[in-house]
From Swiss-Prot:
The chain crosses the membrane at residues 17-37, 77-97, 163-183. Belongs to the Ccs1/CcsB family. GO terms for biological process: cytochrome complex assembly. It is a multi-pass membrane protein. It holds the Pfam family ResB. This is Cytochrome c biogenesis protein Ccs1. InterPro entries: Cyt_c_bgen_Ccs1/CcsB/ResB (IPR023494), ResB-like_domain (IPR007816). Coiled coil: none annotated. It comes from Gracilaria tenuistipitata var. liui (Red alga). One of its GO terms (cellular component) is chloroplast thylakoid membrane.
Length: 435
């Protein structure tokens, strides 16, 4: 078997519709797994959420299986990328070997000159009395493109409906190319920054082979705020970000929220998460003390707490429910002693206490996606092609034999509408021929 035969055999296998559908279903299945299993998390996260001793699912899916199979970064897994490449090649092969030749064949003028060819079509009408001019006018009135040769007529309309499958293939290929550009040239960084601090893009959690991390900009979190609803639930959290260049010049700033990112030269800054980091306070006449705060989840409610020593023997616990409420103070027996506001001084067990500041951190995701325009263009063309696919491709053949005109037609969809068109053509022809 020579190289030409091998290439032809490979092309034939790749252009197989069953293979394309199987690959598409495989891609969809892998994507579902990637949606169920959280991506790009730490090993500790998977150990906590997918323990081996979890019955009965621990034997089927645990953290070791997830890490060994690469399910923690499934969209970057070489096997998934290989499936995408195969699907891409299958679409290309199908487009050039099946769809384009089919379109070229559809554009040919097809005159059927023999009675058996006419009669074998889906719709057939025979009219008395011959008038080529009137039948042409009847077809033209129904928006058909008409070709006339001797005693034969070929007409069609809705050729764009035949183009739709090619456009679908092209849009999927374009979407794949956009995703590939993003995969190779994009990066994602995640930063947790205290309010008022300057940050650099350094905590890279995902990067492409050809991605470039910008080193000529720095950012600063000037302010952070949380908006609460009437029931004290978090509705929105907002960070004011200032971007500086290497010379320290302010080149952009914006109040960033969850659905309103900052975009600068193809780099997007998203608001992701937030947390209370540290509590600053004074005990008695001491200097300002900083105490880390630990996050808890109790009865589906998020709380932050820290333990403060009043002296060598006595401790109290400070509990924060949200930034708008007072800070609750408990003793070691979990009894509520009192509540305190920021900058308020109270006396607890003969010791003065003043809360100076609640220090928060905001989560900022920095991302570049160079293929996003190509991807969105592919999706737009895909939606457009779906609309185009509903256009019926209809063909009509007319031939005059002795004293009769034989009309045959076929369509790829909307059969009832096409039958109505045949009847309308017949009525117009009869009206002008017999009047």
């Amino acid at each position: 078997m020579n190289i030409k035969n091998i290439l032809w055999f490979t092309l034939k296998k790749l252009s197989n519709l069953s293979l394309s559908i199987s690959l598409l279903l495989l891609i969809a299945s892998i994507s579902i797994i990637g949606t169920i299993i959280e991506q790009n998390q730490s090993i500790v996260y998977y150990q906590m959420n997918y323990p081996i001793n979890n019955q009965p699912f621990g034997r089927i899916m645990n953290w070791k299986i997830i890490l060994n199979l690469g399910l923690d970064h499934i969209y970057l897994n070489p096997c998934f990328v290989l499936v995408l490449v195969l699907f891409f090649c299958s679409l290309l092969a199908c487009t050039f070997s099946n769809q384009l030749p089919s379109l070229r064949n559809a554009r040919k003028w097809k005159f059927l000159q023999y009675k058996n060819h006419i009669n074998c079509n889906n719709h057939f009408v025979e009219l008395d009395k011959i008038s080529i001019c009137n039948i042409i006018y009847s077809l033209y009135s129904n928006n058909y493109y008409i070709f006339h040769k001797e005693n034969n007529i070929y007409a069609y309309k809705g050729l764009s409906g035949r183009i739709a499958p090619i456009v679908v293939h092209f849009s999927i290929i374009l979407t794949f190319i956009g995703s590939l550009i993003s995969l190779l040239g994009g990066f994602t960084a995640q930063e947790i920054i205290p309010t008022g601090e300057i940050f650099h893009i350094k905590n890279i959690i995902q990067s492409g082979f050809n991605s470039e991390i910008p080193n000529n900009i720095t950012g600063k979190i000037k302010d952070f705020d949380i908006k609460y609803g009437p029931d004290n639930s978090v509705e929105q959290f907002v960070s004011k970000i200032i971007i500086y260049n290497n010379q320290g010049k302010n080149i952009n700033q914006k109040q960033v929220s969850v659905n309103s990112p900052l975009i600068l030269k193809g780099i997007t800054f998203y608001q992701t998460d937030w947390k209370i980091d540290t509590l600053r306070f004074k005990i008695g006449n001491s200097k300002i003390i900083q105490q880390p705060i630990i996050k808890y989840k109790i009865n589906n409610q998020i709380l932050w707490s820290c333990r403060l020593p009043l002296n060598k023997e006595k401790y109290i616990f400070l509990v924060i429910a949200n930034l708008n409420d007072k800070i609750s103070i408990y003793d070691i027996s979990n009894n509520l002693l009192t509540s305190i506001k920021l900058d308020e001084t109270i006396v607890v067990n003969n010791t003065t206490l003043k809360i100076v500041e609640i220090m928060t951190k905001t989560g900022i995701q920095v991302k570049t996606d160079p293929g996003i325009i190509v991807t969105y263009t592919g999706f737009f063309i895909l939606m457009l092609s779906i609309v185009i696919s509903y256009i019926s491709y209809s063909q009509i053949w007319v031939t005059s034999i002795i004293q009769n005109i034989k009309i045959a037609g076929s369509t790829n969809r909307a059969t009832l509408t096409f039958e109505e068109e045949i009847i309308n053509i017949q009525e117009i022809y009869t009206q002008y021929t017999w009047s």
